[in-house]
Swiss-Prot record:
Gene3D superfamilies on file: Aspartate Aminotransferase, domain 1, Type I PLP-dependent aspartate aminotransferase-like (Major domain)
Keywords recorded for this protein, A-Z: Aminotransferase, Cytoplasm, Pyridoxal phosphate, Transferase
The protein, known as: Aspartate aminotransferase, cytoplasmic
Gene: aatB
GO cellular component: cytoplasm
Classification via CDD domains: AAT_like (cd00609)
EC number(s) from the headed UniProt entry: 2.6.1.1
Length: 438
């Protein structure tokens, strides 16, 4: 292949979009006719407001003293305040004065080893040489690097399947990475639980060798997870179809308070011999939301391809952001490499997940006490930060406009935003919303 052909192929496989000179000239001419200053950017459309962060922005602008924010997935303590974990605070004290030099392109080696070990545990023993891990910009960055790798090195036309519903950014990441995404059944609004039959049917109907994004635990936004028995059936079907798991690991330890229990599905796939991807985030379980700390791990059947895979991942990282940030990864490394700090972290995870479970029960009790129409048991049956309430869009509008309780239009509520001071107010609002829309 000639140099020109190589460049052409590289451009074809990238997200490069050539400038349309005709449209550009039309834009300039239009501006000149209207008397406006000419600009190349007149045809740039206004993008939609992010469905999650847009609600948070509206909350911050609201001056009503009763307002409650249950939109953004960030932990809050009983007083509704952001919480810095004690283990993180101690690690930060140890890191005072640490140098601010560039990290290697693939991040801190010890951080990468500890991240893979945290997720895969003893399941990775004997498989380490078939795994490659790189530090990434939290879960979003890990997903983005992984999806780009899929576009470049999996068979052309490989489709990435995402649960219906899912975290809204999953489809955005695929689109901006030049990869086609589709949906598979997941949530049953009638039972407010898992549509397991629909999920399995969609996996069987998907083309062989498709990629399935699977939430490790604490499914976002529904809070509905498969049982261990169901995970084993999912693995059976994916093996039959040669599908590739891509685990989105945002809540390990935060869901149940047990790091090993929450990692069951990832370790199952590894033990069953899958080639697979995993994207880890330390935003929730370490409270490092703004530090953008995460990791991407890819598992291969063969050791000899790992150096080549790492070289390509590093090329993509270099072109995207050159090298990852230091502070968050150093914090995680400091905690996970110190037995005392690790024990403190595990204790704090149990406390955070325990508070969320307590909020679930108190919300259910408050709704039952008010005799709110309907069955609300799903609130305690779901797991993790979110509950998929089942509220309709008109009911959500009442909560937002009348009660200044901010949540997503889908009815997803971040339970971290509720506490003993506002649960009764929240339940009163739901009673009004449900009864007034019947």
């Amino acid at each position: 292949m000639s140099t020109l052909e190589k460049v052409s192929e590289r451009i074809k496989n990238s997200l490069f979009v050539p400038i349309d000179n005709n449209n550009m000239q039309d834009s300039i001419n239009s501006n000149e006719v209207s008397g406006q200053v000419a600009t190349l950017f007149a045809n740039v459309p206004l993008g939609p407001v992010d469905p999650i962060l847009g609600v948070s922005t509206a909350f911050k602008a609201d001056t009503d003293p009763r307002k409650v924010d249950t939109s953004v997935g960030a932990y809050r303590d009983e007083n509704g305040k952001p919480y810095v974990l004690k283990c993180v605070f101690e690690a930060e004290k140890r890191l005072l004065g640490a140098p601010k030099e560039y990290l290697p392109i693939d991040g801190i080696p010890e951080f990468n080893k500890l991240s893979a070990k945290l997720l895969y545990g003893d399941a990775m023993v004997g498989k380490e040489k078939r795994m490659v891990t790189v530090q990434a910009l939290s879960g979003t960055g890990a997903l983005r690097i992984g999806i780009i790798f899929i576009r470049k090195y999996l068979p052309a036309g490989t489709v990435v399947y995402i649960s219906r519903p899912s975290w809204t950014n999953h489809h955005n990441i695929c689109k901006e990475s030049g990869v086609q995404s589709a949906e598979y059944a997941y949530y049953d609004p009638k039972t407010k639980g898992l549509d397991f039959t629909g999920m399995i049917n969609d996996m069987r109907a998907a083309p062989n060798g498709s990629v399935f994004v699977l939430h490790l635990c604490a499914h976002n936004p529904t809070g509905v997870d498969p049982t261990h028995e169901q995970w084993n059936i999912i693995a059976d079907v994916m093996r039959e179809k040669n599908h590739i798991p891509f685990m989105d690991c945002a809540y390990q330890g935060y869901a149940s308070g047990d790091l090993d229990y929450d990692a069951y599905s990832a370790r199952l796939f590894l033990n069953r011999g899958f080639e697979m991807f995993s994207a880890q985030s330390y935003s929730k379980n370490f409270g490092l939301y703004g530090e953008r700390t995460g990791a991407l791990t890819i598992v291969s059947h063969r050791e000899d391809v790992i150096p080549k895979m790492l070289s390509q991942l590093k090329m993509d990282i270099r072109a995207m952001y050159s090298s990852p940030p230091t502070h968050g990864a150093r914090l995680v490394t400091t905690v996970l490499s110190d037995p005392e700090l690790t024990a403190l972290w595990v204790k704090e995870l149990k406390e955070m997940s325990g508070r969320i479970k307590d909020v679930r029960q108190k919300v259910l009790d408050a709704l039952i006490a008010r005799k709110v129409p309907g069955n609300w048991e799903h609130i305690v049956n779901q797991i993790g930060m979110f509950t998929y309430t089942g509220l309709t869009k008109p009911q959500v509008d009442i909560l937002v406009n009348k009660y200044h309780i901010y949540l997503l239009g889908s009815g997803r509520v971040s339970l971290a935003g509720l506490n003993n001071k506002n649960i009764d107010y929240f339940a009163d609002a739901i009673l009004d919303a449900v009864t007034s829309t019947q």
